[in-house]
Amino acid sequence: MTIADNKKAFFDYFIEERFEAGIVLEGWEVKAIRAGRVQIKEGYVVVRDAEMFLIGAHISPLQSASTHVNPDPVRTRKLLLKADEIKKLIGKVEQRGYTLVPLNLHYTRGRVKCEIGLGKGKKLFDKRETEKQRDWQREKSRIMKGGSKE
């Protein structure tokens, strides 16, 4: 079940590979995610010392958060992947033009997981082409549905 999608990632990048990663979360963050108070549109993934971190994902704390915990909505969160996956991703990211972006947050067997994508940035003309294709698909479905009302 999907919790949050990053539609902007598909508009800005050609996604070549996808990986599922666990996330190290605090208790209040899990509660907030279950309540749907998460946004990953501004998020990105970085590699530091052979570890992966999710930066810029915003998890809004609930009003009922504990008083002894000081919630930080945009803190850096560690991603959990297998060592061989991390090595593979480090090799790819060091190549020119590749980056790691969070694609969505979802549940797998009751745990919150983050799907990350290895993407190559789109140029402006690629984005325009994607927009034209989307408009054409929409227009095609209108025509097939019953024509335009003019």
Curated annotation (Swiss-Prot):
Cellular component per GO, a single term: cytosol
HAMAP family of this UniProt entry?
A: SmpB
Q: Which PANTHER family match?
A: SSRA-BINDING PROTEIN, TMRNA-BINDING COMPONENT OF TRANS-TRANSLATION TAGGING COMPLEX
Q: Say which family it is in.
A: Belongs to the SmpB family.
Its organism's taxonomic lineage begins at: Bacteria, Pseudomonadati, Pseudomonadota, Betaproteobacteria, Burkholderiales
What residue spans carry the region label Disordered?
Answer: 129-150
Q: Which GO terms describe its molecular function?
A: RNA binding
Give the subcellular location. Cytoplasm
**What is the protein named?**
SsrA-binding protein
Q: Which gene encodes it?
A: smpB
* GO terms for biological process, alphabetical: trans-translation
What does the record give as the function of this protein?
A: Required for rescue of stalled ribosomes mediated by trans-translation. Binds to transfer-messenger RNA (tmRNA), required for stable association of tmRNA with ribosomes. tmRNA and SmpB together mimic tRNA shape, replacing the anticodon stem-loop with SmpB. tmRNA is encoded by the ssrA gene; the 2 termini fold to resemble tRNA(Ala) and it encodes a 'tag peptide', a short internal open reading frame. During trans-translation Ala-aminoacylated tmRNA acts like a tRNA, entering the A-site of stalled ribosomes, displacing the stalled mRNA.
Record keywords: Cytoplasm, RNA-binding
Top-rank lineage group of the source organism: Bacteria
Which Pfam family is one of this chain's hits?
A: SmpB
Q: Does the keyword Cell cycle apply?
A: no
